[in-house]
């Protein structure tokens, strides 16, 4: 499972798709989610605005499996 480190409280699923190179621009997020199954914490998700937080898992078949890591929490901050 690949780790995606964020330095904010959350990222949206649309931002995440761009971070993982599943899409080349943010404008493609809506199309991508309508054409491909994306699983967040084991459930199909189609909302590009879905907030992904520390320890959320994302599975994009054909692209990869990912876990969200909050940089602050990973460095010993409180959750």
Describe the function of each predicted region.
Residues 9, 36, 64:
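A generic "binding-loop/recognition-motif" signal
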